[in-house]
Amino acid sequence: MAGLPEKEKLLRNFNRCANWEEKYLYIIELGQRLAPLDDAERTPAHRIQGCQSQVWIVMNPGENGVIEMRGDSDAAIVKGLIAVVFALYQQMTAQDIVNFDVRPWFEEMSLTQHLTPSRSQGLEAMIRAIRAKAADLS
């Protein structure tokens, strides 16, 4: 997840955007920072159900129990949303991820109010899947 801002910086950058067009562009730019997944990682086991777009998230325990996350999507805005979620969860252990609620951060960014219902549902599906995978790893 190199290149993603820390939570507080993400929020500051998001709130500096003058309008929602700028915020969408920032989200897409964050998605471009994610390393692409190998074809071998695009398996049903890593696919997130409940997203209209195709979404894959790979989670592995790293150094000191910190969970390493990698993800991709076939849609630019969704890939950006993956990056936003990863930025909020970065440097956390599996138990930290299970205990951490990202939704207040989305509210501070007014994110869910400006997403289509299907994207909001997909975002919730991503969060549920990440927390479930983290619970399995803890």
UniProtKB/Swiss-Prot annotation:
Record's subunit section: Homodimer. Interacts with SufS.
Main location group: cytoplasm
Keyword line: Cytoplasm
Listed PANTHER family: CYSTEINE DESULFURATION PROTEIN SUFE (PTHR43597:SF3), SULFUR ACCEPTOR PROTEIN CSDE (PTHR43597)
Compartments (UniProt record): Cytoplasm
SUPFAM superfamilies for this protein: SufE/NifU (SSF82649)
Gene (name only): sufE
Its biological purpose: Participates in cysteine desulfuration mediated by SufS. Cysteine desulfuration mobilizes sulfur from L-cysteine to yield L-alanine and constitutes an essential step in sulfur metabolism for biosynthesis of a variety of sulfur-containing biomolecules. Functions as a sulfur acceptor for SufS, by mediating the direct transfer of the sulfur atom from the S-sulfanylcysteine of SufS, an intermediate product of cysteine desulfuration process.
Protein name, as recorded: Cysteine desulfuration protein SufE
Single GO cellular component term: cytoplasm
Family recorded in the similarity comment: Belongs to the SufE family.
Domain of life: Bacteria
Pathway, per record: Cofactor biosynthesis; iron-sulfur cluster biosynthesis
Gene3D superfamilies according to UniProt: 3.90.1010.10
Species name: Cronobacter sakazakii (strain ATCC BAA-894) (Enterobacter sakazakii)
Gene Ontology BP annotations: iron-sulfur cluster assembly; sulfur compound metabolic process
Active site: C51
